[in-house]
UniProtKB/Swiss-Prot annotation:
Reactions performed catalytically: L-citrulline + L-aspartate + ATP = 2-(N(omega)-L-arginino)succinate + AMP + diphosphate + H(+)
Residue positions binding ATP: 8-16, 117
GO MF, one annotated term: ATP binding
E.C. number: 6.3.4.5
Localization of this protein: Cytoplasm
Major localization listed first in the record, in broad terms: cytoplasm
Protein name per its UniProtKB record: Argininosuccinate synthase
GO CC annotation terms, alphabetical: cytoplasm
Subunit field text: Homotetramer.
Binding site for L-citrulline: 87, 123, 127, 175, 260, 272
Biological processes annotated in GO: argininosuccinate metabolic process; L-arginine biosynthetic process; urea cycle
Family: Belongs to the argininosuccinate synthase family. Type 1 subfamily.
Pathway info: Amino-acid biosynthesis; L-arginine biosynthesis; L-arginine from L-ornithine and carbamoyl phosphate: step 2/3
Amino acid sequence: MSERVILAYSGGLDTSVAISWIGKETGREVVAVAIDLGQGGEDMEVIRQRALDCGAVEAVVVDARDEFAEGYCLPTIRNNALYMDRYPLVSAISRPLIVKHLVAAAREHGGSTVAHGCTGKGNDQVRFEVGFASLAPDLEVLAPVRDYAWTREKAIAFAEENAIPINVTKRSPFSIDQNVWGRAVETGFLEHLWNAPTKDVYAYTEDPTLNWSTPDEVIVGFERGVPVSIDGKPVSVLGAIEELNARAGAKGVGRLDVVEDRLVGIKSREIYEAPGAMVLITAHTELEHVTLERELGRFKRHTDQRWAELVYDGLWYSPLKAALESFVDKTQEHVTGEIRMVLHGGHIAVNGRRSAESLYDFNLATYDEGDSFDQSAAKGFVYVHGLSSKIASRRDQR
């Protein structure tokens, strides 16, 4: 048996061409691995058969939907992770899981090399290769699209010359990546920052102006930072994401038009759709406002952003990320309760909160009868709190 290459296979043009190209250029057999992350679209069995038709000696489909939701989407929720305060890491959190399964396939199928179809301009090349280096430094990595400067035109020509059974056209307006956590769209006319997205950009969300007269009220319940119910009915993490994708997407919630700082040093425009993700992160953040002590909440907002940056930058397996997650596990001990929201016109409006772990004390907060806050103590507190600023100002005014 010849040396084998384990290929991350999407079923698209580049990775279909890569199967034949790797065989011709290296003489190695290719095992194609397709991961089901809830992306929808083509049936995974169709994708598996396409890989075989393109020349793979074996084609493996892994149903990783629950694993993705529990092990990758859930930490994103608990860390309120929005890169640059906007992007819920739709693609970034999927790459380490794909890496994990490619390494497992390499061990099972005798692979000495892993391969991906990433370009040299994006973040995914880093996420894949740093992941491989972390989990399996003995494996060689092939990146034919990047290392041999493939263009779409070159890939189509190769497919035609070698009778690769895939239907393609030379004009496709967008590059799309999607999974159950969301959908990312880039390139084409979107590369011009002044161009507004057209209707055909979107697939997970409806036009926010539709169904304007019928808002959807939803209650999301959490236990220790984990979403466990919707409108009082128990759900898995995957079930919560899927239901909220449908309900929030129908109200146009989760559309994001972002210019982001890529790891490779350039700025890139991306259109994201993440209805379920944005509802869950919004609800979780709001519940933390109710249940976390002030200093803990302030500090966690810093670690949330750092966690998002580490994941975006491909450092899923880093010691710092692991340490931050140990911290976050501790913070979630009291993040239990329910958040009520109205989904309407592309917006999420929180209008109710309840928790047995709440730090909100009505008697301390009220300005009406029953007020138990000792306002007479405030005068001395204000004096001491502002004393250092008062002394500094006195000096600076000399």
